[in-house]
Amino acid sequence: MNFNDFHCGCMKPCETYSYAQYGVQANPPSKSDLPMAVLFQEGEQIFLTDTEIFLEPGYLYLIDFIFLATPEADSFMQITPKINGTLQLLYSFFAPTGSASRNASASGSFTVPVTENSASVSFNLTYPDKVRNIDISGAVSVTLLHKIKGTKC
């Protein structure tokens, strides 16, 4: 797949736009997907259902995330994005805490080309069994970048 494969191929630019931002404020169990709430959402290609962001086919999307959490000292949290239910370790973020601090943060970005069928994106939180409780907050931003070549404008 090349960069030029994502251009629309129409005589004029595609006039579709869609972007959203979702907030997270929770204390979920380890190995669970983070619940999100809509902060804002424009367009029809991106929508949220509790823990999953759905992306309509035919577009390239940019996903940005930032999270701040309070696991216990000498511990960690790990945020792993899931695309269509599959953990994406390439985009995973491991955030350790030190002996004097309980704060951990994670951030990253990645693109998702959605060609034929809609795709779902979620964020899985993992932390050690010794951590009794973790408070996490953050935001996920989703931006439709452009139409993928070969799909109708």
Q: What are these model-derived regions, one by one?
A:
Residues 2-153:
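Extracellular jelly-roll beta-sandwich "head" domains, especially the C-terminal globular C1q domain
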